[in-house]
């Protein structure tokens, strides 16, 4: 070996790894170990199942939000697409059950397609408005949020929709496979799909290119409008899938599921290091961030911390995450 060979110091290698992956994996491990040691109820089977199931819904939702953020967009409507898909799918299943009560597979299929279709409709409105009409993503998705919320409430009058096939509720929503909730496998499948798109497809490369520099991508021949629409469609479809999974778990269509879904999906993306300016974001980090948020929330629930304080604390965590990642990126660029 030549004396001129230069090897980076271990500390530099560790720092570059930190700059690439951020603080999240370390903090997540520390949090889990601390909870296991000091909060005995955290390791109960029921609590672990609840965390895994809740994390799965947020992972699916956040993967879609990340896709829109990568192209430099923003989607406030995901929190309304979830209940919209919930009530639409439930209403269609109840209707189909009355028409053909013995055709469970067809009943479920029609409901699922209707729920996903509602997500596609919202995503199409958002995508076309942003890509072709040049409407601000914030404004158009805020409008879609209001529309989707209003439609869901109008369809149900705020009353839960019961009567879905028990095979759908017990088999998919509350079922276990290899001792894990089925929602976990659904989330894992979607994460694998998004990871594949990001790393091995033309669409993945183009989405990053659009978020990095829209004008340069256009000059390079990328059909930027088409891929912008696809990004918003993909985001809304994943929100609808999350809504379908939640509906199956709850056992009814709900027009009001959670007021914080949009905030949580954005928080997971930001904590994961997804750039709000576009062009940066990895689905594996978003998955870890979703787990981090749900474990943190679960810990505060177990410790009986006031929900109002929880909201403040989570907001502080988001701000701190953005600050730490920004410092790490600046130091990495200097080195």
Tell where the protein language model's regions lie, with residue ranges.
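Alpha-helical transmembrane segments within multi-pass membrane transporters and channels
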Residues: 98-145, 288-292
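Helix-loop-helix "hairpin" substructures at the membrane interface of multi-pass membrane proteins
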Residues: 107-115, 121-126, 179-254, 265
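Helix-loop-helix hairpins and the membrane-proximal interhelical loops
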Residues: 14-56, 244, 248-253
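Cytosolic-side transmembrane-helix boundaries in multi-pass membrane proteins
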Residues: 1-31, 219, 223-226, 296-335
């Amino acid at each position: 070996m030549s004396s001129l060979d230069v090897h980076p110091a271990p500390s530099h290698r560790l720092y570059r790894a930190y700059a690439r992956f951020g603080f999240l994996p370390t903090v997540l491990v520390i949090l889990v170990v601390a909870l296991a040691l000091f909060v005995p109820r955290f390791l109960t089977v029921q609590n672990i199942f609840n965390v895994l199931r809740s994390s799965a819904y947020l992972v699916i939702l956040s993967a879609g939000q990340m896709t829109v953020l990568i192209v430099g967009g923003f989607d406030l409507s995901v929190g309304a697409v979830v209940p919209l898909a919930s009530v639409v799918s439930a209403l269609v299943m109840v209707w189909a059950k009355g028409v053909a009560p013995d055709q469970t597979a067809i009943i479920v299929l029609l409901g699922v397609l209707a729920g996903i279709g509602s997500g596609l409709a919202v995503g199409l409105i958002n995508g076309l408005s942003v890509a072709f009409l040049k409407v601000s993503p914030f404004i158009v998705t805020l409008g879609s949020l209001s529309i989707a919320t209003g439609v869901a409430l109008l369809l149900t009058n705020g009353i839960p929709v019961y009567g879905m096939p028990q095979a759908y509720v017990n088999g998919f929503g509350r079922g276990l496979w290899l001792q894990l909730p089925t929602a976990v496998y659904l989330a894992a499948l979607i994460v694998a799909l998004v990871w594949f798109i990001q790393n091995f497809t033309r669409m993945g490369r183009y989405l990053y290119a659009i978020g990095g520099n829209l004008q340069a991508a256009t000059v390079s021949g990328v059909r930027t409008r088409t891929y912008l629409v696809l990004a918003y469609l993909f985001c809304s479809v994943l929100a609808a899938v999350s809504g379908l999974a939640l509906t199956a778990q709850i056992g009814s269509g709900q027009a009001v599921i959670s007021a914080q879904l949009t905030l949580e999906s954005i928080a997971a993306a930001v904590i994961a290091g997804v750039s709000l300016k576009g062009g940066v974001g990895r689905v594996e980090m978003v998955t870890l961030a979703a787990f981090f948020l749900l474990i943190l929330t679960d810990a505060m629930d177990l410790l009986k911390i006031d929900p109002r304080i929880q909201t403040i604390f989570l907001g502080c965590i988001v701000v701190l995450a953005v600050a730490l990642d920004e410092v790490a990126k600046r130091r990495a660029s200097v080195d």
